[in-house]
């Protein structure tokens, strides 16, 4: 738990610092919450919950309730100390009003109130207030209920007492402004993912999520997220569809140089490295100094153990291999969570930790804990070292395979794959490539495309299930190599990790997966997304991967009105409009597109490829740990969860993603 330097009794208006006013938020909302689409909408929930999490991290809150109300408003209630309501010395108004109406006002900026804070990365609950048509704040404190309501960030009346209570804490309810957001419909899955993550990261806290919007059967929904063992449970959850090398979780929780550090590690029989890192509950997708410290400790400690064990060092000598840092991380799943009082974030998405002091602290903590584990568990230590030797052998084979491939790589003067119909424009920022399922659809796509900016790569045969193969075998798959060569990704560029994908010479700004609008198509989408997620994650992180959205139907009314329908709902809307909701088979004609090959070149261009009219879904990774767990499930041996997931998500391959 974070240290508290103020006691509960003196957390008051004097601890609330004010940094700037609210006017700018409504003018430029995207600057404050990232965007005004679904992502920004859900960010409002995260910002509100962050206040409650700060109270939990400070040791004052054990329960948080998040409710999606029937009218799409959100209620967040906790049992913390309650936002202070006394008068603010400088502004001569209630501290609650200051917190709710001034951007970046809050106890988290006053070092005495919270030593660390997750919400600091965001913009505070006042931003939520500014972007809501209505908001109601209630504080349960000193036996009273204090209340204030707002419209678009402006208070409707001063803070007042509206009743008495035995409760303690804060309740916030807000109604997002439909004139600001492109959608105000909340997705259960997106909120649930973040609440689950927060429960894992804050051991012992109980987060209850309710959805009061009745489903088709008239039922509401509730789920409780609670992880008594925190990160130990988190790493097991992420790894639950993989086969473990051994059942232990290597775990540490300590403090070094004033930095609280918690790490959980498991080894599995797969071949990818999956490390998820967090700073103050924020997912640092781009890594940073804490990840650098972890990797350095892992390499140094395991190498020292192998060197000092005569049997293992003899094994390495016999195999004639030199072990590299990456070999120690193959088949490793880890969650690293640290708390930093003043985090410095860098990188493209501001999700990379820059604090230099953190690397040494994490390296020291992990080094000590891992050394102790290896000494106390020689059997498991031997299993890890055997896997490391196998990884090193495979890496050397991969380098040879890669070098033979890169001799023919477009970036080194060789030819492009013969199947690629390239575009004539040479400016990558203006170019896009379609990865098209099957030759017949590839033919239509080649005819229908804009040859100046659009390239087509038909994919024939099975896409390799990359989750299940040794790293070097990926380079032996023709379909995978065609993709890698075509888009211009290079591996093991001088000075980089052998497995690091370098996208500096990416040949296209958009890489678009175009498959049939059915379950098989969704499965192929998933295989290709897994390839990028596991081997070329930067392509996704930097926003280059998309999924095309071909129509499901062409609906015609009396040969006069034609409409492409991309969902079952759109088809029903067409029937409602022209035929009283029923397909009578006379005035209405419905053509179901079972595959891309059923469309001619003109139709394919019009519906799926024309930048002016097409629907593209960008593949993003909002929550890397959840994506990791989903991808390992989709590529795992258990057929039933995979079939269920793909059938449920066939109309939208949103794995966040």
Feature names for model-found ranges:
Residues 27-45:
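Conserved short strand/loop->alpha-helix "switch" segment adjacent to the catalytic nucleotide/phosphoryl-transfer site
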Residues 89, 346-359, 564-570, 574, ...:
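Helical (often loop-to-helix) elements that flank the catalytic cores of nucleotide-handling enzymes
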Residues 82-87:
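A short glycine-centered beta->alpha linker in the GHKL/HATPase_c
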Residues 88-89, 96:
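Short adenine-binding "F-helix/F-box" segment of the Bergerat
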Residues 1-15, 22, 44-46, 54-56, ...:
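GHKL-family ATPase ATP-binding module
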